[in-house]
Regions:
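Acidic, metal/ion-handling microdomains and their immediate structural contexts
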Residues: 191
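N-terminal secretory signal peptides that target proteins for export/translocation
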Residues: 1-5
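Bacterial N-terminal signal peptides
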Residues: 7-18
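Transmembrane beta-barrel domains of Gram-negative outer membranes and organellar outer membranes
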Residues: 23-177, 181-184, 194-239, 246-252, ...
């Protein structure tokens, strides 16, 4: 127990280290259980994405979003997994306006906007034993600002999140879910913090080298609470395929189901587990 306590203290310390991230164009990814399932100790993945009909709330525009340098990495020590990830560069092509921009947002010079982020760091702690029929995990972390309010792709504000998740496997089928709270900063001086529901549900069918999966994930403004600009409800359905075990390729088709999520998109990446 003392050893687990030391790991937990280390995880909390690492989670509180400032690490760059932006705000809310895309929802938080679902937790990847492979390291806690014993498939390895270290994991890394890099890729990119194309998303159509994406809204940039602060700029008041809708268009095509390109994500260059999507990445994530994770390291396991005992029951604890340390996660880091983000997007090196986002390039947005304005196509139509749906609202007036926020006062500090500058007009685009050539129909394009680009900015860094988001980046994030998180800690996941397994709460159950390895033989438990349903595994449980506590996940918490932060996304800190690197974005420029003048660009208008995301708000320059700090976010924190914490979720409780579970996973059950029967044969080749695994189902996982997590839900919790996102405590997000805002651009509204009269309402400086916004609390949203953060959630993800995923099902996958492991047939060896090929693993098809479907994921539903997003964030939801509470009932009876108005949406604050830059903190809107987000939701995506992702139908994907992972090919390979130790080294793998992943491709996902994205369909948004809220006003501020993409109409359609594609995410591709390559990674390795060791």
């Amino acid at each position: 127990m003392a050893k687990v306590g030391r790991y937990l203290a280390l995880a909390i310390f690492l989670c509180l280290i400032p690490h760059s991230t932006s705000a809310q164009l895309r929802p938080l990814d679902a937790f990847d259980w492979r390291l806690l399932d014993g498939e390895g100790v270290v994991m890394g993945e890099v890729g990119g994405g194309w998303l159509s009909d994406q809204r940039a709330s602060l700029a008041g525009t809708e268009g095509t979003l390109w994500e260059a340098g999507n990445f994530r990495a994770a390291w396991r020590t005992g029951r604890v997994v340390i996660e880091a990830g983000g997007t090196v560069q986002r390039i947005f092509r304005d196509e139509r306006a749906f609202a007036a921009p926020e006062p500090e947002v500058a007009p685009d010079a050539d129909g394009r906007r680009h900015d860094a982020g988001d980046y994030r760091i998180a800690t996941a702690v397994r709460l159950t034993g390895e033989r438990a029929p349903v595994a449980a995990v506590l996940r918490f972390g932060a996304r800190l600002p690197t974005t420029d309010n003048r660009v208008g792709l995301d708000r320059d504000a700090t976010d924190f999140f914490a979720t409780i998740g579970g996973r059950a496997r029967r044969g080749s089928v695994a189902v996982q879910a997590e839900a919790g709270v996102g405590i997000f900063g805002t651009r509204d001086p009269d309402f400086e913090q916004d609390d949203l529901l953060v959630y993800a549900v995923k099902a996958e069918y492991d047939v060896g080298l090929v693993v098809p999966a479907i994921t539903v994930l997003g964030q939801q403004v509470g009932a009876g609470h108005h949406e604050i600009r830059g903190n809107e409800s987000l939701g995506e359905v992702r139908a994907g395929l992972r090919i390979g075990r130790r080294e793998y390729l992943r491709a996902e088709v994205v369909r948004g189901y809220t006003d501020f999520s993409p109409g359609w998109g594609v995410l591709v990446s390559a990674g390795a587990v060791r």
